[in-house]
Structures are given as structure tokens and as C-alpha cells.
């Protein structure tokens, strides 16, 4: 086999590979003879079909099957011999004639080689959130609202009321698609509608009609409506007032708590602290990763981005439970490209840093992280034992330990400031971020 390496710009290069004719023809001949012994053909007994007839009728097909098997073997050997780190590959067949060498080009996309420097340029705003009894009481109040019962009342609309409404949304005086609905239930203050919509209903009475003006958010999914000033003609058809359950032993049992109200409040606080810790870690880590992407200079392999896009589509399909009749491949790659590119770039940067630094996940550190994570489950010890039996889960934990160490290492060199934030705003932002990332 003859291999010619043609270097191209950046992370691209090509291998021109030539396989001797006798090697190809020999394999094809053997496959034709093997086929002749098993194929059924009119006029011949099984195993007695002449190889010449098989070649005449199926020779081209057999040759292509042989080549399809042989090409990956040859370019894999060439890649190994040339010590190339390949991210993606496309094969272009050049010459394929009996009695002549097989020639093909393997167009390669390589993993970029780069070194990350300038960590001091990274700016991180570290959120500081105080979790007090006030936030715990508010969380319990939110849980009470989840179990609220509603009864119709004759009064003006107030916060926390459930209202049944009709509405027609208009942009530039014309009704826009998706902006009209009838008999929609809205809980005032829940945030289920765009900002300003629910506030505009406060003070209305049953049977009242009103036109409000609201501006759609900048990041609204429908780009035609993003930042657009619109009007909504609203009719209130029913007003219901919420009645919240008392916080007593019966109420806390709905959450699987057996130790009474005091135990319930303690568990709520512990859960809030645990969730807050992981969210704040994530917020800091996201800023660190964003900063790393800004200072690192390299070309991102498109094949890796495409692979990540395909994985995101399959993950979406899985989240939808396989959704019958839904073809995820009909979704445009553009919907996933930005997130996919970020993930690929972050992964390449972290790998580059880890290759130059010696970060290790000690067994005790993995155990400690596991202990912390399983506290969110009803049966922590049982969950812990199940995870410890799963090699993939343990590998993920080790990777997370190393990722945390790397993040701390970058933070030691970065510009870090602190900013006080509200607990519930942090939770809300986290939910929005998760939804934006599918």
C-alpha cells in the first residue's frame, strides 16, 4: 500500500492511498469462488455454478462489497502509521478498475493542536446567595400553592387568582398567528404568560373587556415577535380564588415526610441548600467555560459539531418518549448548532488543559461526591450501591471530580468578583437555561 500525505490548511489534510491491483483482485477472486459454492442459479446444481458466470453476473457488486470492507482497513492503517488524531473522515474513490491499483482519497479533519494561555483575562462573577428562613417559608408557600383548591368568587382579579379568559393578540393592528385563545386558565403571578400580560389582568371583573399593551421578550422563540410591541384584547369569563392547605402532619405526608412539620421544614431547607450549591457551581463553571472559549484559539472540527447535533436530536427524541410519527431529522441543524459548537469547543479546551496538567480523581473524592449526590434520592444508600455497580456512572463521577478541580485551578488565575443574588431568581434562571438547552 502506498500512502501520500497531502497537508492542507488548518486542521484539514488528505491521504492519497493506492492499493496494489493484485491485492484487490485476489480478494475479489476469493469472494467470487466462495459465492459460487453457495449461490443458487437456474440450470446448475448447488455448489456447481462456474465462477466465471458468478463473475459475469455479480462481479461488480462483489468487487464493490470487497472495496467497501477494505477501504476502512486501509485508511485506518494509514492514519495509525502517520500518527494522526482524526476527528472526521470522508472518502473519495478515484480509480477502481480490475487489473489496476485501487486509488482513493481520505479527506481528514484532525483534532486541533493548541495550548490555552491568558487565564488571567477570564472574568467570573461569583453569585452569593443567602438562604434564610424567609426563603424556606416562601418555598413552603410555593408548595402549598401546588395543592391549592379554587372556588369561583365575585370580585376583582388579584394576584394568585385563577382566571378564565379569552384573548386576541395583535401586532400592528393585525391578529398574529398563535395569539388567539379561548377559555384559557391563567394563575395570576405564575409567570406562565409573557411579562406584563398577567399584571394587565389584575383589577378586572368578570365579564369585563380590556386591551393591554405588552412587549415580547428579546429572547422569545418566535423571532417575528421578539421585542415586538403588541396589544391583547382580553375578556375575563371566570375568577376563582385559591384556598391553600394548612401546613400540618397531613400536608407533609404528601411529600413522604413522617417526622412532622419540623422535620419537613428541615428537609426543605437541606434540599434547597443542596440544589443551590449545585446551581451556583454550574453558574460559575459556565462562566469559566465561556471565558476559556474566548481566550482559546483553534479551528473547531465541523464533523464533531455535526456528531453533537445528531446526539442532541436523539436526546430530544428520547425526552419525547420516542414520539410516534415525529421525525427528529426534519428539525434544522441550526436549532442545535450553537449549543453543539459550545459543547465541542469546551470539551476540546478541557482536554487540552488536562493534557498539560495532572488532575486526578482520588477514590475518596469520588466517594465524597457520590455521597453528596445521592442525598437527593429517597433511599440514598440503596442508590449509592446501585451507582457503584455501574462502571459508566463511576467514570462520569471521576470526570466530574476532575472537571471541578480544573475549574478551581482556572479560578485561581481568573478575575473573580462577587454579586449578591436572590435565591428564587437563581432557580428561575437555571430552569430557563435548561429549557433553552433542550
Curated annotation (Swiss-Prot):
Q: What is its main location?
A: cytoplasm
The keyword Cell cycle belongs to this UniProt entry's keyword annotation = yes
GO CC annotation: cytoplasm
Question: Keywords, A to Z?
Answer: Cell cycle, Cell division, Chaperone, Cytoplasm, Isomerase, Rotamase
Q: Where does the record place it? A: Cytoplasm
Provide the catalytic activity annotation. [protein]-peptidylproline (omega=180) = [protein]-peptidylproline (omega=0)
Identify the InterPro entries for this entry. Answer: PPIase_dom_sf, PPIase_FKBP_dom, Trig_fac, Trigger_fac_C, Trigger_fac_C_sf, Trigger_fac_ribosome-bd_bac, Trigger_fac_ribosome-bd_sf, Trigger_fact/SurA_dom_sf
**Segments forming domain PPIase FKBP-type:** 160-245
- Which EC class does it fall in? isomerase
SUPFAM superfamilies recorded: FKBP-like, Triger factor/SurA peptide-binding domain-like, Trigger factor ribosome-binding domain
Return the EC number: 5.2.1.8
Gene3D superfamilies associated with the record? 3.10.50.40, Trigger factor ribosome-binding domain, Trigger factor, C-terminal domain
GO term, biological process aspect, one? 'de novo' cotranslational protein folding
Any Pfam family matching the protein: FKBP_C
Source taxon at top rank:
Bacteria
Q: Do the record's keywords include Ligase?
A: no
Q: Name one GO molecular function term.
A: peptidyl-prolyl cis-trans isomerase activity
Q: What HAMAP family does the annotation carry?
A: Trigger_factor_Tig
**What does the record say about domains?**
Consists of 3 domains; the N-terminus binds the ribosome, the middle domain has PPIase activity, while the C-terminus has intrinsic chaperone activity on its own.
Its function, per the record, reads:
Involved in protein export. Acts as a chaperone by maintaining the newly synthesized protein in an open conformation. Functions as a peptidyl-prolyl cis-trans isomerase.
* Similarity section: Belongs to the FKBP-type PPIase family. Tig subfamily.
Protein name (database record) = Trigger factor
Amino acid at each position: 500500500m502506498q500512502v501520500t500525505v497531502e497537508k492542507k490548511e488548518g486542521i484539514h489534510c488528505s491521504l492519497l492511498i493506492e492499493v496494489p491491483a493484485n491485492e484487490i483482485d485476489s480478494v475479489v477472486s476469493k469472494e467470487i469462488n466462495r459465492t459460487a459454492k453457495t449461490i443458487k442459479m437456474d440450470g446448475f446444481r448447488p455448489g456447481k455454478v462456474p465462477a466465471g458466470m458468478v463473475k459475469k453476473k455479480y462481479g461488480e457488486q462483489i468487487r464493490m462489497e470487497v472495496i467497501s470492507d477494505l477501504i476502512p482497513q486501509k485508511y485506518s492503517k494509514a492514519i495509525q502509521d502517520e500518527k494522526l488524531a482524526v476527528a472526521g473522515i470522508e472518502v473519495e474513490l478515484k480509480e477502481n478498475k480490475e487489473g489496476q491499483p485501487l486509488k482513493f482519497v481520505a479527506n481528514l479533519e484532525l483534532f486541533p493542536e493548541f495550548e490555552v494561555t491568558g487565564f488571567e483575562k477570564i472574568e467570573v462573577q461569583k453569585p452569593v446567595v443567602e438562604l434564610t428562613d424567609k426563603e424556606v417559608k416562601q418555598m413552603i408557600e410555593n408548595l402549598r400553592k401546588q395543592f391549592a383548591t379554587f372556588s369561583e368568587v365575585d370580585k376583582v382579579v388579584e394576584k394568585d387568582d385563577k382566571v378564565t379568559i379569552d384573548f386576541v393578540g395583535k401586532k400592528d393592528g393585525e391578529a398574529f398567528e398563535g395569539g388567539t385563545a379561548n377559555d384559557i386558565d391563567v394563575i395570576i403571578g405564575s409567570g406562565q404568560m409573557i411579562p406584563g400580560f398577567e399584571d394587565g389582568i389584575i383589577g378586572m371583573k368578570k365579564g369585563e373587556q380590556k386591551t393591554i399593551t405588552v412587549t415580547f421578550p428579546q429572547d422569545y422563540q418566535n423571532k417575528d415577535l421578539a421585542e415586538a410591541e403588541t396589544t391583547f384584547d382580553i375578556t375575563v369569563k371566570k375568577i376563582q380564588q385559591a384556598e391553600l392547605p394548612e401546613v400540618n402532619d397531613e400536608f407533609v405526608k404528601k411529600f413522604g415526610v413522617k417526622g412532622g412539620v419540623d422535620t419537613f421544614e428541615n428537609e426543605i431547607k437541606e434540599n434547597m441548600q443542596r440544589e443551590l450549591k449545585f446551581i451556583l457551581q454550574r453558574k460559575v463553571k459556565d462562566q469559566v467555560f465561556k471565558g476559556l472559549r474566548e481566550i482559546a484559539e483553534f479551528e473547531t472540527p465541523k464533523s464533531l459539531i455535526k456528531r453533537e447535533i445528531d446526539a442532541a436530536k436523539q436526546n430530544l427524541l428520547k425526552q419525547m418518549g420516542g414520539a410516534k410519527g415525529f421525525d427528529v431529522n426534519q428539525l434544522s441543524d441550526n436549532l442545535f448548532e450553537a449549543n453543539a459548537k459550545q459543547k465541542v469547543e469546551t470539551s476540546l479546551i478541557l482536554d487540552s488543559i488536562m493534557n498539560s496538567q495532572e488532575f486526578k480523581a482520588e477514590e475518596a473524592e469520588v466517594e465524597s461526591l457520590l455521597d453528596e449526590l445521592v442525598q437527593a434520592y429517597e433511599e440514598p444508600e440503596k442508590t449509592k450501591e446501585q451507582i457503584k455497580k455501574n462502571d459508566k456512572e463511576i467514570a462520569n463521577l471521576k470526570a466530574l471530580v476532575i472537571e471541578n478541580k480544573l475549574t478551581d485551578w482556572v479560578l485561581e488565575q481568573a478575575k473573580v468578583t462577587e454579586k449578591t443574588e436572590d435565591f428564587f431568581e437563581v432557580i428561575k434562571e437555571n430552569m430557563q437555561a435548561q429549557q433553552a438547552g433542550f
